[in-house]
Amino acid sequence: MEADVQRAQQAQLEKGSSVPPWTGIPLQKGLGQRLRQHVNPLQAQYQQPTPPPHWERVYRRLGQPLHLDIGSGSGRFLLRMAQEQPDWNFLGVEIRQPLVERANAWRDELGLDNVHFLFANINVSLRHLFAPGDLSRVTIQFPDPWFKKRHHKRRIVQPRLVADLALLLQPGSPVFLQSDVREVAEEMVDRFLEHPQFWNPYQGPIDDNPFGIPTEREWQCLQLGLPIYRYWLERR
């Protein structure tokens, strides 16, 4: 049923005249395999930390501020961000390896040297990838909702993740959260605000995406008139 709904939504989008803001991003190249929509991050195969890459080989200008996108999906959002903000470095972390491989292939096609995608379970690997103060900005957008209560422990924003980000983010750095599921968005915010190092300067949700570049799920929601719940938090 979910697949039928997604196909219907995609068909509706393709009939529209609006053009998604991924100009220059290859949209048709397939994975060559069937991809699981959801991956259980608690499975044994995802419990080993991913070692950090040789950062000097990843980024041409290593000293630029680093934006971490957690759950980067297909990577189109981050590829476009890298085009728009060449004075930033971008890292997308994704647990579905085929998406990571394709996103890095797209990056190479586009000739970008300020963006990289990494296959990792972020809740296991985060503290192994960075040193305190390495991160300047974090986005977590439309994470898997894991609706069943017994599956909530699979959700990406857990207390351990928040504590690690508090250590790794520079003071004053933003954390941008969004979801089309109100309960998921509010839970993410609550988890961050339970930690004394994070606060909400807006005292509630915000209306717009401050980056002006939507993810694919966000674009779908906008075209279909579905609500999106957005929050901009900051590291104290």
From Swiss-Prot:
Residues 1-23 are annotated as: Disordered. The active site is at residue 144. The keyword Magnesium does not apply. This is tRNA (guanine-N(7)-)-methyltransferase. It catalyses: guanosine(46) in tRNA + S-adenosyl-L-methionine = N(7)-methylguanosine(46) in tRNA + S-adenosyl-L-homocysteine. Pfam families: Methyltransf_4. Substrate binds at residues 148, 180. The gene is trmB. Belongs to the class I-like SAM-binding methyltransferase superfamily. TrmB family. GO terms for cellular component: tRNA methyltransferase complex. Keywords: Methyltransferase, S-adenosyl-L-methionine, Transferase, tRNA processing. InterPro entries: SAM-dependent_MTases_sf, tRNA_(Gua-N-7)_MeTrfase_Trmb, tRNA_methyltr_TrmB_bact. It comes from Synechococcus sp. (strain JA-3-3Ab) (Cyanobacteria bacterium Yellowstone A-Prime). Catalyzes the formation of N(7)-methylguanine at position 46 (m7G46) in tRNA. PROSITE patterns: SAM_MT_TRMB. Pathway: tRNA modification; N(7)-methylguanine-tRNA biosynthesis. GO terms for molecular function: tRNA (guanine(46)-N7)-methyltransferase activity. The keyword tRNA processing applies. Its EC number is 2.1.1.33. S-adenosyl-L-methionine binds at residues 69, 94, 121, 144.
